[in-house]
Regions:
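Membrane-embedded alpha-helical bundles that constitute the cytochrome b-like, heme-associated redox core
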Residues: 1-310
Length: 310
């Protein structure tokens, strides 16, 4: 029983109120990622960079621009060695992530049975119908963005796309690395090597295209993020950012703090003000509610700027 309780404490989903951080007694931050989650992310993106640096010159080794890179990294053998080592680390990171998710599911099975999509918000679920509202907003048929939750559409798409991509590029990478094992011991036809090469290469092009053209703009290069969203490093987001981008999550966190730790509202009057605002704004129709929340976020930002300049 002691081991089980220790296991549950280690992998238990954080309560909503635990995501709110009070900095210097006057500033609210929201914690999105734990240290371990950030390390997993660093492992994936750092090895991905090395995969690109070494993989594309190998694919286009006859093209002039690739030759200096190949020479710099020890020729074809050197490039292949670095590519394989970084690929092995990347695939290990992926497997560790899968194990981590399984352990979280086991430790929170009671919550999963109660409300799977409510607690495991990274999984696409019924609330993702808000994506339709997002399209309407982009096309001008809606005045405000959707009432996004903790994970918006791009978070979920990128998270699960990495899973599919790692299966596709990882398995084919192993086949290309150890062709004699797969065609010899496992008895796969020789054509498997050519098919694996095409899948491995095309998946790499697809991954780089999506990350360079879509993901980087939405997550890092957008006007409100440029030059970078540092949440991958700090794990936290500002209150203003959370109100604007994930209003449903913000309201739920504030209400959870008020309901589960009411003493904090007495200790920090600004928290009580936030709670009263949330209660009032939730009485409004959705679009008007989102508009009021954005206005409130701008008000908080103006106060913060005045405080810094004053």
């Amino acid at each position: 029983m002691g081991l089980w309780e220790a296991f549950k404490r280690r992998f238990r989903l954080r309560a909503e109120q635990d995501k709110l951080l009070i900095v210097d007694g006057e500033k609210i931050m929201i914690q999105k990622f734990t240290l371990f989650q950030r390390l997993l992310h660093v492992g994936i993106f750092s090895t991905f960079i090395w995969q690109i640096i070494t993989g594309y010159p190998l694919k286009f080794y006859k093209v002039e621009w690739a030759k200096p890179l190949i020479a710099l990294l020890g020729g074809i053998p050197g490039e292949m060695t670095i590519h394989r080592i970084s690929g092995f680390i990347m695939f290990s990171d992926f497997l560790l992530t899968v194990l981590y998710l399984i352990l979280i599911l086991i430790a929170n099975w009671d919550l999963a049975k109660k409300d799977f999509f409510g607690y495991f918000k990274i999984v696409p679920g019924p609330t993702d119908v808000t994506f339709v509202h997002y399209i309407k907003y982009l096309l001008g048929f809606r005045k405000v963005p959707p009432d996004w939750d903790e994970y918006i559409w791009v978070d979920k798409f990128d998270f699960w796309a990495v899973g599919w991509g790692m299966l596709a590029i990882g398995i084919t990478g192993w086949i290309l690395w150890l062709p004699e094992v797969f065609t010899g011991y496992l008895g796969l036809p020789p054509e498997t090597i050519q098919i694996a090469y095409l899948m491995h290469s095309d998946e790499a092009v697809l991954a780089l295209g999506w990350i360079a053209l879509v993901y980087m703009y939405i997550v890092h290069y957008g006007p409100n993020k440029f030059p970078m969203d540092w949440i991958w490093l700090t794990g936290t987001a500002s209150e203003v950012e959370w109100i604007e981008e994930r209003p449903r999550s913000y309201r739920r966190i504030i209400k959870a703090v008020a309901e589960n730790e009411p003493h904090l509202l007495e200790k920090y009057p600004f928290l009580k003000e936030r709670y009263q605002f949330v209660l009032e704004v939730e009485k409004l129709p959705e679009e008007e509610m989102i508009k009021k929340m954005h206005e409130y976020a701008h008000h908080l930002l103006e106060k913060e700027v005045e405080g810094r300049n004053g």
